[in-house]
């Protein structure tokens, strides 16, 4: 990929972000719950799931094992380019429901990875902006043009790593007098006494922030639910 295209992506991503922040400041709501709409318990709910590869994908697979597929449809599985493990996990998750018609109600969405292990800081900034641009296009702009009243998904579940921070930021843009995506973050089983960096960044934005160990729940808006995986 040429440097010119990287710069172009960076400029577009930065423009999206600045515009979103300005809109958010102009139309800031008194509280997040003021836009919450009533949803009957048996109503259909579109679901977005981020599969972060490796252990994150394995934990998410366990979290979804008891999912009510009749209610949560359609489902969109978001994964990073080249993550074959997560693609196999999607196949396993969906096939576990056997012959249910609803188990076919799912889609796949591939995004560039925001950061790779050991990646230098400068190139990380470029890759994050690239991911932000693609995510803003696919999760915010295109759905907004298709149907301004409906978000990309009704509910987004994430558990790390870094790319999920970009997804949450983009999903949060709609909280400007629009129906928005509810966000649930589940901290990794491995985080026993403290939150991950992704968790610390997402905590102020999540509607529900769940941890699996009591020592990791260090504030009022963190919910300890015990072991979930």
Curated annotation (Swiss-Prot):
The protein's topology relative to the membrane is: Single-pass membrane protein
Give the domain of life. Answer: Eukaryota
Can you supply one Gene Ontology CC term for this chain's record? Answer: nuclear membrane
Membrane-side (Cytoplasmic) residue stretches:
28-229
Stretches assigned to the Lumenal side: 1-6
| GO molecular function (one) | N-acetylglucosaminyldiphosphodolichol N-acetylglucosaminyltransferase activity
Question: Which residue ranges run through the membrane?
Answer: 7-27
Q: Does the keyword Endoplasmic reticulum apply?
A: yes
Might you name a Gene Ontology BP term for this protein? dolichol-linked oligosaccharide biosynthetic process
Show the InterPro entries listed in the entry.
Oligosacch_biosynth_Alg14
Q: Where in the cell is it found?
A: Endoplasmic reticulum membrane; Nucleus membrane
The reply to whether Phosphoprotein figures as a keyword in the UniProt entry is no
User: Keyword annotations for this protein?
Assistant: Endoplasmic reticulum, Membrane, Nucleus, Transmembrane, Transmembrane helix
Q: What is its main location?
A: endoplasmic reticulum
The task this protein performs is described as: Involved in protein N-glycosylation. Essential for the second step of the dolichol-linked oligosaccharide pathway. Anchors the catalytic subunit ALG13 to the ER.
Give the quaternary structure. Answer: Heterodimer with ALG13 to form a functional enzyme.
Family that this chain belongs to? Belongs to the ALG14 family.
Write down what this protein is called. Answer: UDP-N-acetylglucosamine transferase subunit ALG14
- Organism for this UniProt entry: Cryptococcus neoformans var. neoformans serotype D (strain B-3501A)
